[in-house]
């Protein structure tokens, strides 16, 4: 039986991932910030906000999946920016210190990251061979998060970094936010509309994570995005058609930056990111184009 330790296991990605892992011969320990009782014999919860939590984590952990981190979908005040950074760095460091103190390290660590690692560009296509240093706040979060995760290599653990694109799901996240203006007939172009949206269907993301965990030749960073990214204007048009709504309005970049503040970078300063590395290992996307993904997710 394979032993999993998961942070962020009750979030949008984590909860679906847990449901998928449960189908195999496994036991899952989920680290949470509050007391929780499990009614499932395959799942146990450990409140790692409490002193002594380390002693409640099983000794024979095979796989660590680190998804913990505060949501980006809030206004980035100076205080919240600190929360965004520390929620990722401190949790990753705590995991490292846990296994450093033990004689047995996990075989593999899957650590979440984001395509915000790459600089915004309207014309460049980014693959995993591209290396960079932090250039803004979001890229600094990603860079530091990956750096802390890579410490696990010192323990002999295989480290896999998953740079998530925009996750499309019915359970929350970007898609639910993007649907709102179309619901009220005010959806349309954002800024120039030429910025890239490198997206991924939640089901493909879950399968990609498990594929990388189970593939012993997988290590280092992987772009977890669909093979065909779209520019925002076409993305919005495709979403509007799926919802049977118009795509006619325009929100200027300046207005969005004034309203959203630094958080506007998530929708305006984006990248074209391609999943070359995972495809080279043989992974096949079920939802490779946006129309197919939205038809599955939106039943209007």
UniProtKB/Swiss-Prot annotation:
InterPro entries: DUF1731, Epimerase_deHydtase, NAD(P)-bd_dom_sf, SDR39U1. Coiled coil: none annotated. Transmembrane segments: none annotated. PANTHER family: EPIMERASE FAMILY PROTEIN SDR39U1 (PTHR11092:SF0), SUGAR NUCLEOTIDE EPIMERASE RELATED (PTHR11092). Belongs to the NAD(P)-dependent epimerase/dehydratase family. SDR39U1 subfamily. This is Epimerase family protein SAS0734. The lineage of its organism: Bacteria, Bacillati, Bacillota, Bacilli, Bacillales.
């Amino acid at each position: 039986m394979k032993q999993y330790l998961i942070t962020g296991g009750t979030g949008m990605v984590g909860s679906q991932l847990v449901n998928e892992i449960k189908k195999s011969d496994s036991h899952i320990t989920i680290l949470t910030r509050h007391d929780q009782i499990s009614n499932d014999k395959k799942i146990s919860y450990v409140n790692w906000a409490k002193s002594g939590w380390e002693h409640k984590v099983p000794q024979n952990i095979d796989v660590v999946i680190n998804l913990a981190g505060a949501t980006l979908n809030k206004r980035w005040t100076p205080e919240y920016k600190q929360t965004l950074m520390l929620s990722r760095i401190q949790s990753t460091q705590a995991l490292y210190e846990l296994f450093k103190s033990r004689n047995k390290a996990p075989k593999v660590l899957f650590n979440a990251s984001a395509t915000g690692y790459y600089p915004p560009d309207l014309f460049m296509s980014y693959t995993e061979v591209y290396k960079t240093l932090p250039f803004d706040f979001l890229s600094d979060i990603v860079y530091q998060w990956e750096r802390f995760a890579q410490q696990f290599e010192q323990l002999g653990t295989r480290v896999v970094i998953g740079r998530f694109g925009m996750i499309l799901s019915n359970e929350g996240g970007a898609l639910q936010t993007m649907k709102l203006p179309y619901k009220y007939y005010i959806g349309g172009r954002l800024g120039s509309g030429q910025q890239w949206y490198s997206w991924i269907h939640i089901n493909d993301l879950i399968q990609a994570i498990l594929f990388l965990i189970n593939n012993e030749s997988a290590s280092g960073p992987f772009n977890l995005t669909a093979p065909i990214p779209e520019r925002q204007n076409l993305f919005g048009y495709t979403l509007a058609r799926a919802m049977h709504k118009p795509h006619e309005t325009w929100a200027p970049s300046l207005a969005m930056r004034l309203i959203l503040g630094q958080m506007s970078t998530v929708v305006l300063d984006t990248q074209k990111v391609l999943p070359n590395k995972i495809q080279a290992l043989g992974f096949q996307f079920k939802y490779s184009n946006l129309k197919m993904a939205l038809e599955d997710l939106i039943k209007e």
